[in-house]
Amino acid sequence: MRELGYVAVALVAAVSSPAAAQSPRELLVSAAFSARDKPTALARIDAALKGADAEIARNPKNREAQLQRAVAIGYRGKLKRSRGDVLAARRAFEALVAANPRDAEAQMALAGWHLGAVIELGPLVARTALGARKSHGLQALDRAVALGGGRAFFPGYASLNRILLDPADIGRARALAEAAVKGRATALIDRVMQRQAGALLQALRGGNGKSAARAAKGLLPFGRLPD
């Protein structure tokens, strides 16, 4: 079923090409943005999941490993159309947010889960099939941006979601994208989202929200993989 094939999870990794020494975080973004086909992406996701599991075995309280494990499960659920993985990712994101509500990355991951499902399936189907709610996603999205400390990642990812949710909301999406371009790039992921936000701005400046939304879809994780 179509609803089994979608879950959006926040982009919480840094871009580089795959290598044995890569962290789970790096492997996941490589899968999301560098892989040119689904088998390659899944292989990188599997490697990231194994790496996160190994880190958790060494230290069960490792928040970074817990987050990347949840992201990996969500990505796998999206690509394999596994409702079980999709729901498992949600539970993991919720647990991370409950443990630390001020964790901006966990808030963004949960926001992406809800909003991605709504964008892909529509509000009714997303809620019925997966329990995803636009209101929950927007609340987590706004919290993530507020808690993000001016880092580019958070407004950049928010801008993509906002224009996809409402192609008429050009002003808000543009303001977020501009904030991302001007934001602090303390990690590679911030530079990645500055690039994505810059690409979105080009479309937004044309004043065509629907065109900008189409561009945004291709800028999200796995947005350029063939169907």
Predicted regions and their residues:
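Short coil/linker segments at helix-helix boundaries
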Residues: 25-54, 71-102, 112-146, 161-175, ...
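Bacterial N-terminal signal peptides that target proteins for export
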Residues: 1-8
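N-terminal signal peptide c-region/cleavage motif recognized by signal peptidases
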Residues: 14-18
